[in-house]
Amino acid sequence: THRQSSAASDVYKRQVVGCGGGRDRAKRLKMGSIASRLSQKVIFTSDNPRDEDPKSIIDDMIAGVDDADKSKILNIVDRKEAIVKASKVAKPNDILLVAGKGHEKYQIIKSKKIRFNDKEILTQTLKMAV
């Protein structure tokens, strides 16, 4: 709902978002649109690209973004780099939403599962900042 959208934009000023490869392409446009509307800054990144080019997936997400919101977007294909960048530019009292991986502790690239954990990356990055 609009109320939930407004509340989310007040809380999650910065987001890291990705869409999976080999999935519904139409949802990528919606994800790009929603994430850009609900953030002051959003980084589009990879999230299990599987056999697709991660840059093409991000391009699909960008295609769903209104022109007025395009200045909010940064695309960083490398998910670790995206999380580190978002952590470094976050301001005190910002809440950073890193969406997509959830409980998964891997990235699927081509047919390989590569160890990857958003929480570990965030923890390491924040420890280095102290």
What are these regions (language model features)?
Residues 1-10:
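Positively charged, low-complexity/disordered segments
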Residues 9-130:
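ATP-dependent carboxylate-amine ligase
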